[in-house]
Regions:
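An N-terminally biased module of ancient metal coordination in phosphate/nucleic-acid-related enzymes
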Residues: 1-80
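H/E-rich (His + Asp/Glu) clusters that bind or coordinate divalent metals
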Residues: 2-13, 201-332
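Active-site gating/metal-coordination segments in enzymes
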Residues: 3-8, 83-173, 220-224
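Short, well-ordered coil/turn segments that N-cap beta-strands
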Residues: 20-23, 70-76, 96-101, 121-124, ...
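Histidine-centered catalytic micro-motifs
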Residues: 23-34, 165-169, 198-201
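Active-site neighborhood of phospho(di)ester-bond hydrolases with catalytic His/Asp-centered motifs
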Residues: 25-27, 78-79, 102-104, 127, ...
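Active-site environment of divalent metal-dependent phosphoester hydrolases
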Residues: 30-35, 83-86, 108-110, 133-135, ...
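Distinct, well-ordered alpha-helical segments
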Residues: 87-92, 111-119, 174-190, 205-218, ...
Length: 332
């Protein structure tokens, strides 16, 4: 499939290519094949994966990255789709030094199951998700707590092996939620060898959420990282740099969602995805009349990173920070 429009090509040529480093490390990618699901499984009509034929294999990721970033060498850290019907024993099949994978994990998994899954895939860590915890504990998804997402036994194993966790924090308050803040800090203190990567900068997609966060408290914990997946806001990225070490900020995109056409915007202390395509993601507002010519969320994220990051530090955030983290885990 071809993704780029003439407008995308112009954006890359005029805005991105002159400023991007030669290598980019995307720390937040979902890779999934149809065979990860039961036979006959189909996604709802407006699910993002349907844009790509009902799956997003790593071969397609490689092809599309060569199209949208033709002058860059792409590295990735990836995980499967957090879906209750997915086979969590299927971790993305990555190859070579530039590709890393994490195993999906549910609180229902024994340590033995988790260890086997990680060792079989040579995974650098795990990706829990709130829907697994909700299912296991019989909670509504919005009632899930950070402590619900991994068991103490799983965390002890991850701490012993010094692996990483990419954690999408729960609850409607996101990074401003006092319980989230307390439990996130508690994990970092109790499991100092686990590299905690809080996805989407703690899901702080709008300014008030990060202003009411405790991001500065995490600066003293060397095992804490934040990824920037789906953050389109220059101001939020700048605020992060002002209150947390830039050397532990990881560029991430949330591909394949990031390959949809749209932009995340702040509206009245909330956020919404203005969309040029009719796919169901979060708080999407669809331009049904086709008035606006959108580029991809991927390019909007790169625009934000370039605008927010000092030129001398851009390569750190877009490549070096993730490179050091994930190669360090793999080579330990």
């Amino acid at each position: 499939m071809m993704l780029m429009s003439e407008n995308d090509c112009r954006i890359y040529r005029e805005e991105l290519a002159p400023k991007l480093p030669p290598r980019i490390f995307d720390a937040h990618v979902h890779i999934m094949r149809k065979e990860y699901f039961p036979e006959g499984f189909t996604f709802p009509e407006r699910n993002t994966f349907n844009k790509f034929g009902g799956e997003f294999p790593v071969e397609l990721w490689r092809k599309l990255m060569a199209e949208i970033l033709p002058e860059q060498e792409l590295w990735l850290n990836c995980f499967s789709a957090p879906h209750l019907q997915v086979d969590n024993d299927r971790t993305p099949e990555v190859e070579g030094e530039k590709e890393f994978a994490m195993a999906m994990v549910s609180p229902a998994d024994t340590v033995e199951t988790l260890a086997r899954r990680i060792e079989a895939a040579k995974a650098v860590g795990v990706k829990p998700y709130l829907n697994y915890a909700a299912h296991v504990y019989g909670k509504k998804e919005n009632d899930v707590e950070v402590f619900d997402m991994l068991t103490p036994e799983q965390l002890e194993y991850l701490n012993e092996k010094a692996l990483a966790v990419t954690l999408h924090i729960p609850r409607s308050g996101r990074f401003a939620d006092p319980l989230n803040q307390k439990q996130m800090i508690a994990l970092c203190e109790k499991y100092p060898n686990v590299k905690f990567i809080f996805a989407h900068i703690g899901r702080a997609y709008f300014m008030r959420n990060i202003l009411e966060s405790n991001i500065e408290e995490f600066a003293k914990y060397p095992n804490v990282y934040f990824d920037t997946a789906m953050i389109n806001s220059v101001e939020i990225v700048k605020y992060t740099y002002d209150h947390f070490p830039l050397e532990r900020v990881l560029f991430g995109t949330d591909t394949p969602i990031a390959l949809l056409r749209g932009k995340s915007v702040e509206i009245n202390n909330q956020y919404a995805y203005l969309m040029g395509e009719n796919y169901a993601i979060g708080s999407a507002i669809i331009d049904t009349s086709g008035v606006v010519e959108f580029t991809t969320f991927f390019y909007e994220q790169l625009r934000a990173m370039i605008a927010a990051t000092p030129e001398k530090d851009l390569e750190k955030v877009l490549f070096t920070n993730a490179y050091k983290l994930f190669t360090g885990i793999r080579n330990a």
